[in-house]
């Protein structure tokens, strides 16, 4: 399965909306993914242009969450949220929590933002889906700019880019340097959820997480008793594709010490 962004065809599909076509489905009222297609992954080391806050206190969360109050915080982060399937599930499972999806690809993040807007308008429930939002950013560079020390309760890394080539393993989103940043924004007792269909990447994640002094892996019975665990397999678009193709899932959950 070729996933390294630099090995992919750089050409993306034409955005139908730009050609005057309506990207919104007349049946579901939701944006159609075919108008937002982009290559599978993006180079995290490339010099993308991002606006980002100088410090967490500068983030205007109210612009993303209309109902958030000054004493409330974003506590769940889906890193590399893709097309937002799992992010939507988080919003439904935890209506009292504010969850953010972070995605580096511009068309994909546009899709998630449009999807959330459509869900908010479509839902008849007051406040529905106003607890989820998406940011286009590079989480490998700017995570501490958004979150204060110990702010997050849960972080999710679902089907990240494997960067198969050995020379590019340093680009993997789980590495020793970044694990220290994740530990900084995670509260003690907070959880890191990882899922991949690539066994080599799974072994890499487990090795690096277990070698880091600020994490411990949950026992299998703890993983299976977590109500989020069943959702990790199919809620994301990538996870659903693995299920359709009868592929393997490799799960590991870690606790911040």
Curated annotation (Swiss-Prot):
Query: What UniProt keywords apply to this chain's record, in alphabetical order?
Result: Methyltransferase, Nucleus, RNA-binding, S-adenosyl-L-methionine, Transferase, tRNA processing, tRNA-binding
- Choose one Gene Ontology CC annotation of this protein and give it: nucleus
* Ranges annotated as biased composition (Acidic residues): 1-12
Gene3D superfamilies assigned to the protein according to its UniProt record, in alphabetical order: Vaccinia Virus protein VP39
- What EC numbers are recorded for this enzyme? 2.1.1.33
Instruction: Name the pathway it acts in.
Output: tRNA modification; N(7)-methylguanine-tRNA biosynthesis
Q: Which InterPro entries match?
A: SAM-dependent_MTases_sf (IPR029063), Trm8_euk (IPR025763), tRNA_(Gua-N-7)_MeTrfase_Trmb (IPR003358)
Disulfide pattern: none
Q: Which residues participate directly in catalysis?
A: 161
Q: Name one GO molecular function term.
A: tRNA (guanine(46)-N7)-methyltransferase activity
Region described as Disordered: 1-25
Where does this one sit in the cell? Answer: Nucleus
**Catalyzed chemical reaction(s):** guanosine(46) in tRNA + S-adenosyl-L-methionine = N(7)-methylguanosine(46) in tRNA + S-adenosyl-L-homocysteine
Q: Which SUPFAM superfamilies match?
A: S-adenosyl-L-methionine-dependent methyltransferases
Q: Which Pfam families does this chain map to?
A: Methyltransf_4
Listed binding positions for S-adenosyl-L-methionine are 80, 103-104, 138-139, 158, 236-238
Q: Read off the HAMAP family from this record.
A: tRNA_methyltr_TrmB_euk (MF_03055)
Report the PANTHER family cross-referenced here: 3-DEOXY-D-MANNO-OCTULOSONIC-ACID TRANSFERASE/TRNA GUANINE-N 7 - -METHYLTRANSFERASE, TRNA (GUANINE-N(7)-)-METHYLTRANSFERASE
Q: Say which family it is in.
A: Belongs to the class I-like SAM-binding methyltransferase superfamily. TrmB family.
Described function: Catalyzes the formation of N(7)-methylguanine at position 46 (m7G46) in tRNA.
- By its UniProt entry, which NCBIfam families does this protein fall under? tRNA (guanosine(46)-N7)-methyltransferase TrmB (TIGR00091)
In its UniProt entry, what is this protein called?
tRNA (guanine-N(7)-)-methyltransferase
